[in-house]
Amino acid sequence: YMRCGSFPYIASMSDKEEKADTYIEGIYNTVIIKDIEERQARKEKTTDKRKITDITLLKNIAKYLASVIGSPVSVKSIADYIASSGRKVSQNTVSDYIEALTEAFIFYSAERYDVYGKQLLKQNAKYYIVDLGLRRYLLSKRNYDLGYSLENIVYLELLRRGFMVNVGKIGNQEVDFIVKKGDLIE
């Protein structure tokens, strides 16, 4: 589960890792290319949002988010990272591309919650990936980090149980999850 992911077909495979990569690649390319492009075509008719036209940029942002799951990330830090590789991109473009990845359910965003002010903040969200096998595929099997992988699993389980999940800080201490269901905040 933690290495190859949780897509149902993978559980029935022998030689899981080799076959899983091919299977996950097919899912990823289908979602990235077909689903996001179709969603953008529908959206183009009803909104003035920027159309996702650069699939390479979209994939680079997906790889970056996969490499930092469970860490606070800003749109500016992603734009700066991409600029460091020689490509200039605006923060608005990065924001639109992240939105496309979350609308396609490849990533989920956990917004920061001000514990004292009891309100959502729009900076330094954490992103979690839909499946750890997909993360392994995107990162070419490097840097298996148990802590962030477990945090990703807990996040997805909290969502599955119907909680709204945020992240926060109290003083200098990070709060991994602030969960809300109905009027109850834990």
Question: How does the language model describe each region?
Answer:
Residues 179-186:
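Active-site beta-strand-loop-beta-strand hairpin of nuclease catalytic cores
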